[in-house]
Amino acid sequence: MTSFAHRCGIHDDARAAALSRAALLAGGLELVRFAWCDVHGVTRGKTLVAGAAAKAMMDGVGMVSTLMLKDTSDRTAFKVFEPGGTADLPGFGQANNLLLLADPDSFRQLPWTPASGWVQCQPWFQDGTPVELDTRRVLQRALARLAAAGYGMKCGLEVEFHIYRIDDTRAQMDPSLAAWPGLPPAVSLLHPGYNLLTEAWYDLAEEPLRIVQHTAQALGLPLLSLEIELGPSQVEAVFEATDAMTAADNMVLFRNAVRQALRRAGYHATFMCRPPFPNIMSSGWHLHQSLVDARTGANAFRRDAPAPGTSAADAGHTLSDAGEHYLAGLLAHARAMAVFCTPTVNGFGRFRPNALAPQSVLWGRDNRGAMLRVVGECADAATRIENRIGEPAANPYLYLASQIHAGLDGIERGLRAPAATDAPYGDADVRLPTSLGEALQALQGDSTLVDAFGSAFIQYFTRIKQSELSRYELAEDKDDFQRREYFSRF
């Protein structure tokens, strides 16, 4: 009998070889987690006993389709049981089943739980057609468009987050206090903060940071450093640059893994931008990006010598023509792409003056107050653009796809960047959105990004985010809303 993977047209010699490698790695395992990344960047899925996992690698794992329609509280944002409730979403009516098919190349043994494997999946309709609303497919399409233009993408990740010591879970686990969403655990600080990169605070935090290190390295993630950030209990993980899809996959796995591994040891890790406490510092996800020539692998942003007639304030002094066009595209679509970089109500509280976070649509040369920071000099093979508007709770596939579509528009139209800023918190012609609602409106008003992502995806995405926003606007206690909505879930 033909397997579901064959019917989907994805089972070739390469996948068969990857399955063989996964089978070798799976020896001695008892359980395998089949995981999928939802629109919010949260992993969901099913855990199968080892005896059932081999068949599931070929025939898929059933998943209720409403998992793709959830807002950040896990409420379904579409009326799937009402006539016309999913008219714009063919194949999603009546909470029907989708099938998850695994990528055997992603198979790993989990280091924090005994005899358990993990494999990454993507959803398919039961007739063997791909679910195009899947966010990993959104990035795959963006990368295909980039490849057609002759480029690949390389990304390095700098991820700030918070680790707390768990003091009490009684309220969180008290059945009489269960709610939708519920209370997070009671926590205390890991380090007092306000002493950036100090070794003494690192020593205070070493036990959980060693767990982060061992977990990341056991999973094969290209971790470079773990650092003490400025805020209380705030840390940062820095990763070596990889191709774009690998970087996005790594971000999904890293967040998922460290939260679980730390929880077992009595710590609470959160990638919520602004945890629900006074005197915190916001966390950002700084995305370093460059394009590479698809034929040679050379950095397409590198310029061997400054363009004639340019000064240090000009993009062409450091960036190639393609690099300047890409930079200009990011600036042109900054307001529209902001919701993919900062997709939560909570994250927009980060955009404030003199906080090492941007407020305006500007670029700077090695300027950490600017939205876009150009890093490198002429003839530097590591020349790149750092986007500083992302929050660590962002869906990695959508974050990276937004960069590709915005940057490619700049290349295709030959856009030129304005002069670099040396006053990122001064007056500016264009400001970043200051709320989720404003960011959604900016996205809907940008026909270039709507066309690039596809109007069906934009309608789907905005409907789900609007559900989150509407509940926030109705909440009497806005702080309690964010505490319950984000602190445990991200």
Predicted regions span which residues?
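ATP/Mg2+-dependent ligation/transfer catalytic cores
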Residues: 1-225, 247, 431-490
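C-terminal accessory/tail domains of diverse enzymes
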Residues: 2-27, 35-42, 246-247, 257-271, ...
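Glycine-rich, often proline-containing surface loops adjacent to acidic residues and nearby aromatics
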Residues: 115-123, 232-240, 283-288, 382-384
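Secondary-structure boundary elements
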Residues: 144-154, 214-222, 247, 254-270, ...
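Core alpha/beta catalytic barrel or barrel-like domain that forms the active/cofactor pocket
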Residues: 154-162, 180-199, 219-238, 269-286, ...
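Short beta-strand elements
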Residues: 174-187, 285-295, 361-363, 370-376
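Short, contiguous, pocket-lining structural segments
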Residues: 200-208, 225-231, 243-254, 277, ...
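Hydrophobic/aromatic-rich core segments of domains that either
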Residues: 272, 286-305
